[in-house]
Amino acid sequence: MQQLRDLHVLILGLGASGLAMARWCARHGAVVTVADTREAPPQLPTLQAECSGVRFVSGAFTASLVEGTPIRAVFRSPGLAPDVVAPVVDAARAAGLWQGGELSLFGAGLQDLQSRFGYSPQVLAITGTNGKTTVTSLTGQLVARAGKTVKVAGNIGPTLLDTLSDAMAQAEGDAQALEQQEREAEEAQAAEAARLVEEAAQAEAAAQAAAKAKPEEQAQAVAQESETTEPQHAEANEAPSEVAVAAEEEEAAPLLVQAPVRLSAMARVLPQVWVLELSSFQLDSSEGFEPTAATVLNVTQDHLDWHGTMKAYADAKAHIFGQKALMVLNRDDAAVMGMLPEPIRVKLQKPVVRAHVTFGGDMPQRPGDYGIEAVNGMTWLVRALEADETRKRRKDEEQELHIQRLMPADALRIRGRHNAVNALAALALASSAGCQLAPMLYGLREYRGEPHRVEPVAIVNEVEYFDDSKGTNVGATVAALLGLGADRRIVVILGGDGKGQDFSPLLAPVAQHVRAAVLIGRDAPRIRDSLQSCGVTLQDAADLQAAVQACAQLAQAGDAVLLSPACASLDMFRNYEHRAEVFRDAVAELADAAGVSMEGAL
């Protein structure tokens, strides 16, 4: 990247993203300073080992990191709260410096590859409070199943810039090999062409020699032919001659056929599609990032301690669409649909609507949109198509739709109506990248889901146990309850560190779908207060093992036991993975006692 060469760059924060930015900038010739409020962040030894020329400073983030220095660009790590970096960011803004984060550098990297090699991949970007890892992983799988080369990165890991660096390094070797193969093929073609020319020349020389050897025979044959031919008028003789000359001239005229644009070897070996999972933290500093298609799956309360307000949180999410991306919108979420800008109105012209596709749990009402249809007791994933694209409609005439049934929702391995909607989002994104439908539908059937996201664990005594330990906020748990509760009753485990959330949105789905709720952790009393009026059994448990035992007693045949705490885990566990491990171990004890295998879940 030419714009980084010799540029003095300041990177705020030395986490995984900060380290990736430092590597990237140093590799492209920047003079890099990394600042962190910690004296010895865990990534410091790696930074010092890999980027020996990078300067590290510790201490508070103050304007002095920028003012009076040669710094000309400031990139901040996504985990740093706005108020923490504000003094530096404000000083950088006042000085007119280049600002952004890892996403900005990723976008600049793609622009550089486009200008140097003509590389223009499809970039599919995904965010949302819940479901983004599932949709990101599934979209990547669908793109690959459709035969396109793809890289998946971002919040899902690994980092954007590390993945781009690895792809570029791999592509350089692949491009050299491809160029060598093409040179060898061209040389072989040239040799074959030369051989054919030589053979033709030899054949012509032989024919000329044969002709010189028998001049008398040729003259006699011509004389005989002249005697048998009737004389014709001069005008008649001239006409064919003129036609022949004209034909020769026309044949000799060059045909102006434009040669197809040939991409460079680098552009042909780099990934055709990028699928990126992006958090609100990353999107808060996404200046210069322009995907080709993007989605916000949903917006529910989360990370308000970081963003401050729901509006700031939603605004950060909306940055994902950039200025030109196809917007893939969830019809079921009013906050998401509110991100669609008003049509641009030009005098005497039809209003111009931003390009968008919608998906949702209801029937689609617009060509190109995706939805769910229930018919004759079966639920289908469907897409709306225009019934007759060739027929012109009157202004006041409603558009006639053809509903294309794609596959039964029961054919999905991932459970719940919310996951059927996630599948529709992935289909819409992958379709926008030019992926064919048939192989994608096979890919949907193959996808088994992500760990700890409504993941089936076992069936014990006709009760199915699900691990949704990744459900660390109220919105995730609401989605899980609505998804699983469509065809069964649920005994749910709730509780942990609520991060100051409002638990009242749980009230309606718990009342509708839950047989009993078992409460654990620091915020169990707050959850009990929010659910007191729902008419459902509420039972406290001292720990997760006791909660699983209680659920086994409360559940009835055909029910589901769901660990979906709606809370963070750090009050009782190392992380949500540790919480899931304890849950699975407790379910394994139940399975052992019942004499069944943990592989009993579908």
Region annotations inferred by a language model:
Residues 2-125, 162, 445, 453-455, ...:
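Short, basic phosphate-binding NTP loop
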Residues 2-3, 8, 21-28, 404-514:
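Nucleotide phosphate-binding/pyrophosphate-handling subdomain across enzymes
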Residues 15, 38-40, 156, 333, ...:
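Residues in the short beta-alpha loop(s) of Rossmann-like NAD(P)-binding domains
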Residues 30-38, 328-331, 491-494, 513-522:
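Short internal beta-strands
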Residues 31-36, 151-152, 275, 358, ...:
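Short beta-strand "acidic-cap" motif of Rossmann-like dinucleotide-binding folds
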Residues 44-45, 504-559, 598-602:
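C-terminal helical cap/extension that packs against the catalytic core
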Residues 47-48, 67-76, 80-101, 107, ...:
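Acidic, Mg2+-coordinating active-site environments of NTP-dependent enzymes
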Residues 108-158:
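Walker A (P-loop) phosphate-binding motif
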